[in-house]
């Protein structure tokens, strides 16, 4: 019996559509002689799997549909929940292996500032940067290039 691969795509962010395209590319290039491949569309409201041309809901309790259980997941989800550690934690809890890094590393690298803080002590060259917090109000009239340079992180 060939391993059953769920190619997950979609997600909860503005990257949803590009993720669907990425998933389609993966679907087009997986060796169907070696693997039994299923497209799984992840959306905030529902997760659906395509079986014989029909879309059916995934049972979230065990990531299955009808009598189909997946052996491995190919993660093509951009943004949340595919790149921030959420989906990785979910599959870890079910014991289903997946492509990509661990939940912990995914969560870290999703936050670019935290990633740079983590890497900086290891002597890697870092670009100078400024952190802007969405809730902060910025007086753009008072900000100049010189002002920004004076407040850059090392």
How would you label these PLM feature ranges?
Residues 1-104, 108-110, 114, 121, ...:
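ATP-binding N-terminal substructure of ATP-dependent carboxylate-amine bond-forming enzymes
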Residues 147-154:
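Single conserved hydrophobic/aromatic residue that forms the stacking wall/gate
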């Amino acid at each position: 019996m060939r391993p059953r691969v769920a190619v997950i795509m979609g997600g909860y962010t503005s990257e949803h559509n590009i993720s669907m395209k990425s998933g389609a590319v993966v679907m087009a290039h997986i060796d169907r002689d070696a693997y039994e491949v299923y497209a799984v569309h992840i959306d905030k409201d529902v997760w659906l799997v395509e079986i014989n041309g029909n879309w059916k809901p995934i049972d979230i309790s065990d990531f299955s549909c009808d009598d189909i259980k997946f052996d491995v997941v190919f993660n093509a989800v951009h943004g949340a929940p595919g790149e921030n550690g959420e989906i990785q934690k979910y599959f870890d809890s079910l014991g289903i292996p997946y492509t990509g890094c661990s939940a912990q590393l995914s969560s870290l690298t999703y936050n670019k500032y935290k990633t740079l803080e983590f890497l900086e002590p290891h002597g890697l060259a870092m670009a100078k940067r400024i952190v802007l917090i969405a809730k902060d109000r910025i007086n753009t009239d008072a900000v100049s290039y010189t002002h920004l340079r004076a407040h850059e992180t090392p």
